Amino acid sequence: MLDSKLLRTQLQDVADRLASRGFTLDVARIESLEAQRKVVQTRTEQLQAERNARSKSIGQAKQRGEDIAPLMADVERMGNELSEGKVELDGIQAELDALVLSIPNLPHESVPVGADEEGNVEVRRWGTPTSFDFEVKDHVALGEKFGWLDFETAAKLSGARFALLRGPIARLHRALAQFMINLHINEHGYEETYTPYLVQAPALQGTGQLPKFEEDLFKISREGEADLYLIPTAEVSLTNIVSGEILDAKQLPLKFVAHTPCFRSEAGASGRDTRGMIRQHQFDKVEMVQIVAPDDSMAALESLTGNAERVLQLLELPYRTLALCTGDMGFSAVKTYDLEVWIPSQDKYREISSCSNCGDFQARRMQARWRNPETGKPELVHTLNGSGLAVGRTLVAVLENYQQADGSIRVPEVLKPYMGGLEVIG
């Protein structure tokens, strides 16, 4: 969340910057609540001082043998008024807190200004879109030909937007995840992490999914116990490792990587990508998270994005890198790069990774800090996250880019050790 001091001292500037994201900040409401808060706080502070003085005078009057009943009555009345004032102040603060939690992050000055995905800027391309001398099949046709990609059975089990993988395609899916994890551990210096797939609400509030995006989550209600949510991304569990912590400067940067299933209701995606594995309720992802000192976060974003790009390069999959514009960035991000991989059957690039610097936005919500050696004081860390990569979409890209005329699939060179030396599927 944003610094409350910033909202008090530079409210209109914040509103102007948020407008570039297409977000309208309710300036009048915040100003009204802040004014109410100041009035009530001043009144309660004055009342507390007066009550303290009256309480002190009770002892003095008692020593003089005076009737202290009127003073006692005044102190009791003031105590009741203070209790009422605290309730009023808590109510105002709760509304302010709820407003602040609904406000997205401020975009970095280097982020291109735009209303939607049309305003995104291509930064670079790698590889040439794959060309074929035969009619291209999509991943659904390729997978269903041998019965290894089964949406009908998945629908029988779980409904729409699920997939059942079997045989060599299931193995290829596993190979991709293992390859990604090993690459990030061995070449990029990440620590492999196994996290819970169920988290409590404070973890999701910490990374920004709650309260604003609850409809996108799968919730498990438990009588007499805290609700649990299936993680929409391992970003939630990995980033919250440092929730409430004060880290030593020598611990930074922290670099975590995890392979997990992810669960999303896709509430806003009705009618979009209904065929195949592009948009699922359950999908696997290898997620990278970095916790860094504030001065290092922009350089860390470039490094993180490069780590994700390396996966695509080694798989020899054509892709492009986009700098997202202000209107297309995620809620918690200060700057984001998206990687889009070439999907031959769609004749276009599709998102396969999103790499974001969230600045101190998540850290403030989580109270994740480090001790700055220059000041000796705890300060907020910066957090970053990125897909390295979405395993299902990478599988789609491999199936389609490595297809052959007979419907068989060549196994990418870097995956052969994970496939027992198998060179062709089908």
Curated annotation (Swiss-Prot):
The keyword Ligase is annotated on this UniProt entry: yes
Keyword terms of this UniProt record: Aminoacyl-tRNA synthetase, ATP-binding, Cytoplasm, Ligase, Nucleotide-binding, Protein biosynthesis
Residues involved in ATP binding: 264-266, 351-354
SUPFAM superfamilies attached to this UniProt entry: Class II aaRS and biotin synthetases (SSF55681), tRNA-binding arm (SSF46589)
Main localization of the protein described in the UniProt heading: cytoplasm
The EC number(s) this enzyme carries: 6.1.1.11
Keyword hit for Repeat: no
Compartments, as annotated in UniProt: Cytoplasm
GO CC annotation: cytoplasm
Pathway: Aminoacyl-tRNA biosynthesis; selenocysteinyl-tRNA(Sec) biosynthesis; L-seryl-tRNA(Sec) from L-serine and tRNA(Sec): step 1/1
Regions annotated as coiled coil: none
Annotated InterPro entries: aa-tRNA-synt_IIb, aa-tRNA-synth_II, aa-tRNA-synth_II/BPL/LPL, Ser-tRNA-ligase_type_1, Ser-tRNA-synth_1_N, SerRS_1_N_sf, SerRS_core, tRNA-bd_arm
Reaction(s) catalysed by this chain's protein: tRNA(Ser) + L-serine + ATP = L-seryl-tRNA(Ser) + AMP + diphosphate + H(+); tRNA(Sec) + L-serine + ATP = L-seryl-tRNA(Sec) + AMP + diphosphate + H(+)
One BP term from GO: seryl-tRNA aminoacylation
GO molecular function: ATP binding; serine-tRNA ligase activity
Binding residues for L-serine: 233-235, 287, 387
Enzyme class per UniProt: ligase
NCBIfam families membership: serS
Record's subunit section: Homodimer. The tRNA molecule binds across the dimer.
UniProt family annotation: Belongs to the class-II aminoacyl-tRNA synthetase family. Type-1 seryl-tRNA synthetase subfamily.
Record remark on domains: Consists of two distinct domains, a catalytic core and a N-terminal extension that is involved in tRNA binding.
Function noted in UniProt: Catalyzes the attachment of serine to tRNA(Ser). Is also able to aminoacylate tRNA(Sec) with serine, to form the misacylated tRNA L-seryl-tRNA(Sec), which will be further converted into selenocysteinyl-tRNA(Sec).
Record-given protein name: Serine--tRNA ligase
Species of origin: Pseudomonas syringae pv. syringae (strain B728a)
Lineage: Bacteria, Pseudomonadati, Pseudomonadota, Gammaproteobacteria, Pseudomonadales
Gene this chain is encoded by: serS
